[in-house]
């Protein structure tokens, strides 16, 4: 990832988890408060029900006592009346039977009361245990409902995270595809540059760096600005000395002007010499007798003049050829400079665009990777909490 960017500021995962834990803690506290209120209401209802049962039990006890008293007072009166009869032989047996009948109901009544008290105790214990089981059942049902709600919320969050993860994965794939396309374009540009170098080498051209455009030595040098010329033009430019291409071209143009001025001067001198020679030829017949002694000097002067004229003609022709060659080289160089400068500017623009697109893609890739890492951490945290809730639910169901 290398190049630092100004990516967006992420929300710490710890803060988000603490906010979720606080929300869950608030939900748990509210649930416990509602559960405590329900327990208090159930305890009050249970006390009222127990008092009502005790009242009903007392009424039943009083009714049963009255019934037993009525049932056993009537036989005792009949037995006392029969005991006053004059039958002496059966009186002892009847008295013994009456006493046994009076004793047996008392014992059965005490046993019934004891059994009734035991049944009441068992009933009370059963009612208390039933109330406790009812409370525990309601508590467990409430906890199960709460856990179901939490699980549903977690499942919705997980589904949302999965959707976001899928969208980010698709976005990442698109960014990778764009990176591959840009890489392919970059490879094509590199291949074009390689073919250009091969063509330059094939045609025997020479690459000359253009250090300062427009000849301004105070301007920053343009990165990647080059010029391709032939070897002859390169030799001519090397003869112009060191420096930027524009400066050397101006030097060559100045030398051209100097040569042209020299040629014009030589032409003027040649015309003057021709006029002098023609004047000398016209006066040579008249002065033949006077200048017999100076013939050798005239011949020598004519030879020197002819030699100078031939030299000047040769220099003139050579200068004209050099001027023509330089003009052709300058025009060709100007065309090549314009063409390659345009190509270099286009290449620089494409390179800048590719670099900007690459930096943008790298920033987006880092952002996407950070989001994916954050979602993976959130997913693992939620998965752990979900497993913990499932374990608690399983334990509660096992206890139930």
UniProtKB/Swiss-Prot annotation:
It holds the Pfam family LRRFIP. It comes from the Eukaryota. The modification Phosphoserine is found at residues 18, 77, 80, 88, 92, 96, 100-101. Residues 1-28, 53-119 are annotated as: Disordered. Residues 73-102 have a biased composition (Polar residues). Belongs to the LRRFIP family. This is Leucine-rich repeat flightless-interacting protein 2. Residues 53-68 have a biased composition (Basic and acidic residues). Residues 29-71, 106-202, 245-393 form a coiled coil. It comes from Bos taurus. The keyword Transmembrane helix does not apply. The modification Phosphothreonine is found at residue 99. May function as activator of the canonical Wnt signaling pathway, in association with DVL3, upstream of CTNNB1/beta-catenin. Positively regulates Toll-like receptor (TLR) signaling in response to agonist probably by competing with the negative FLII regulator for MYD88-binding. Interacts with DVL3 and FLII. Weakly interacts with MYD88 in resting cells. Following LPS-stimulation, the interaction with MYD88 is rapidly enhanced; the complex gradually dissociates to basal levels after 6 hours of stimulation. Interaction with MYD88 is regulated by LPS-induced phosphorylation. In the presence of LPS, competes with FLII for MYD88-binding. GO terms for biological process: regulation of DNA-templated transcription; Wnt signaling pathway. Keywords: Coiled coil, Phosphoprotein, Wnt signaling pathway.
């Amino acid at each position: 990832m290398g190049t630092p960017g100004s990516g967006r500021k992420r929300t710490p995962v710890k803060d988000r988890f603490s906010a979720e834990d606080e929300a869950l803690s608030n939900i748990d506290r509210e649930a416990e408060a509602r559960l405590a209120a329900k327990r208090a209401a159930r305890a009050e209802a249970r006390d009222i029900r127990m008092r009502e049962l005790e009242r009903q039990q007392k009424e039943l006890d009083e009714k049963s006592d009255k019934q037993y008293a009525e049932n056993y007072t009537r036989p005792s009166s009949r037995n006392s009346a029969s005991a006053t009869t004059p039958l002496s032989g059966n009186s002892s047996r009847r008295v013994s039977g009456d006493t046994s009948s009076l004793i047996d109901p008392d014992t059965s009544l005490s046993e019934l009361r004891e059994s009734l008290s035991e049944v009441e105790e068992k009933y009370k214990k059963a009612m208390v245990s039933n109330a406790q089981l009812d409370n525990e059942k309601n508590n467990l049902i409430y906890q199960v409902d709460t856990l179901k709600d939490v699980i549903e919320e977690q499942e919705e969050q997980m589904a949302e995270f999965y959707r976001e993860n899928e969208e980010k994965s698709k976005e990442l794939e698109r960014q990778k595809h764009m990176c591959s396309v840009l890489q392919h374009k970059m490879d094509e540009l590199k291949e074009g540059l390689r073919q250009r170098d091969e063509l330059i080498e094939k045609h025997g051209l020479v690459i000359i760096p253009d250090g300062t455009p427009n000849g301004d030595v105070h301007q920053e040098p343009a990165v990647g600005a080059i010029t391709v010329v032939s070897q002859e033009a390169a030799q001519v430019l090397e003869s112009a000395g060191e420096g930027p291409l524009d400066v050397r071209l101006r030097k060559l143009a100045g030398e051209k002007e100097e040569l042209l001025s020299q040629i014009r001067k030589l032409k003027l001198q040649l015309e003057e010499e021709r006029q002098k020679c023609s004047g000398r030829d016209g006066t040579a017949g008249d002065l033949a007798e006077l200048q017999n002694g100076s013939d050798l000097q005239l011949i020598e002067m004519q030879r020197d003049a002819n030699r100078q004229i031939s030299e000047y003609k040769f220099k003139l022709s050579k200068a004209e050829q050099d001027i023509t060659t330089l003009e052709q080289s300058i025009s060709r160089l100007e065309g090549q400079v314009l063409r390659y400068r345009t190509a270099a500017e286009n290449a620089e623009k494409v390179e800048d665009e590719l670099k900007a697109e690459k930096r943008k893609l790298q920033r987006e890739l880092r952002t996407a990777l950070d989001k994916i890492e954050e979602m993976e951490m959130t997913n693992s945290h939620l998965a752990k909490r979900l497993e913990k809730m499932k374990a608690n639910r399983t334990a509660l169901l096992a206890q139930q």
